From Swiss-Prot:
Disordered, as annotated region: 98-135
SUPFAM superfamilies noted in UniProt: Ribosomal protein S6 (SSF54995)
Record keywords: Ribonucleoprotein, Ribosomal protein, RNA-binding, rRNA-binding
GO molecular function: small ribosomal subunit rRNA binding; structural constituent of ribosome
Top-level taxonomy: Bacteria, Pseudomonadati, Pseudomonadota, Gammaproteobacteria, Alteromonadales
Protein's name in the database: Small ribosomal subunit protein bS6
Function: Binds together with bS18 to 16S ribosomal RNA.
Length: 135
């Protein structure tokens, strides 16, 4: 079996169905005794250029170990699914399991937001305590 990196973009109006699509596509891989090494749902993102007059799409990244037949089946499923705007399948030298730069950036952004909200809630508590002691 070979290692592949698969990225597909879904129409933004179909974002609710992405979970089902991921389940169906990972099922194609696992049914053929393949392995999913990394699966990241990047969510809606801005496109670099419009595709079918759309400026956003829902991105999904998968790193898999699979047979060529199951990857062909996936590509066919992408081609015949109107909700999939674009897809790309690349063969890689080995399994990639660490988080992608996109996922790392999202984690850092979430951590910063959590720290900011924590600081603001602490400041609110200090203000409330100051008001109570003034009364």
């Amino acid at each position: 079996m070979r290692h592949y990196e698969i990225v597909f973009m879904v129409h933004p109006d179909q974002s609710e169905q992405v979970a089902g699509m991921i389940e169906r596509y990972t099922g194609v891989i696992t049914d053929a005794n393949g392995k999913i090494h990394r699966l990241e749902d990047w969510g809606r993102r801005q496109l670099a250029y419009p595709i079918q007059d759309l400026h956003k799409a829902h991105y999904v990244l998968m790193n898999v170990e699979a047979t060529a037949e199951s990857v062909e089946e996936l590509e066919t499923a992408f081609r015949f699914n109107d909700a999939v705007l674009r897809s790309m399948v690349m063969r890689t030298k080995g399994a990639i399991t660490e988080a992608s730069p996109m996922a790392k950036a999202k984690d850092e952004r979430d951590a910063r937001r959590a720290a900011i909200s924590e600081r603001s809630s602490e400041a609110d508590e200090v203000e409330e305590n100051a008001e109570e002691s003034a009364e």
